[in-house]
A protein has these predicted regions:
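C-terminal ends and interior cores of transmembrane alpha-helices
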Residues: 72, 93-113
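Short helix-capping/hinge motifs at transmembrane helix termini and TM-loop junctions
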Residues: 44, 109-111, 140, 175-178
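Helix-loop boundary and gating motifs at the non-cytosolic
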Residues: 3-68, 115-116, 124
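A short, flexible low-complexity segment enriched in Lys/Arg and Gly/Pro that occurs
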Residues: 1-2, 135
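Short, surface-exposed linear patches
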Residues: 39-41, 104, 114-115, 128, ...
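Generic alpha-helical propensity signal that fires on short helical segments
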Residues: 37-39, 109, 122, 177
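Substrate-agnostic recognition of the 12-TM MFS/MFS-like secondary transporter fold
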Residues: 15-30, 63-80, 87-96, 117-177
């Protein structure tokens, strides 16, 4: 089913920008500022994987890389399917839900006993976040005319910055109180 929108509709553009408000928080808080530090603080300095011992920072880099290998292999295929079948919104929802549930699961990552939760949660969150962006970005030409691309995109970008900074401040405040 193909979803149609009236181009340059203020409500639709605001909704599109609010998606950026929400998803940009992931890239700042989870990928960059809070989770990497948390991961290194609750894991052993050396993590045993198969027959190999590796520093926890290398393990963290490895799980990020593995997530993006899945994205690099899968997304060209899925975006082609979405374009051909008109299921762009389906994939946007699917990957947003995957990323959201994976972020929720990361709450239960406390120490080495729950390393698998942190690993799987972070990988799925990264896959969900990155994949949802592909389908989110594909909506720009659907919701705006070409002369409004820059303004619409900048609005989403600005909302994303504001939303992510607000969440980072809240998170830092909560961490400081503990």
């Amino acid at each position: 089913m193909q979803t149609t929108f009236v181009k340059n509709d203020a409500k639709v553009i605001k909704s599109w920008a609010m998606f950026d408000w929400a998803n940009s928080s992931y890239s700042l808080v989870i990928s960059s500022a809070i989770f990497p530090t948390y991961f290194l603080s609750v894991t052993n300095a050396t993590i045993h994987v198969g027959n190999t011992d590796m520093p926890n920072s290398s393990y963290f880099s490895f799980i990020i890389s593995l997530a993006y290998v899945f994205v690099a292999i899968g997304l060209p295929i899925l975006s082609g399917i979405a374009d051909y079948s008109g299921k762009r919104l389906y994939f946007l929802r699917l990957f947003t839900i995957i990323g959201s549930l994976a972020c929720i699961s990361m709450y239960f990552f406390r120490d080495m006993n729950t390393l698998w939760i942190g690993t799987v949660g972070f990988m799925l969150a990264s896959i969900g976040f990155t994949s949802s962006l592909v389908f989110y970005n594909s909506y720009l030409p659907v919701i705006a005319t070409e002369d409004k691309y820059d303004k619409t995109s900048a609005r989403g970008f600005a909302y994303g910055y504001v939303g992510s900074v607000i969440l980072l401040i809240v998170n830092l405040f909560v961490i400081e109180k503990k």
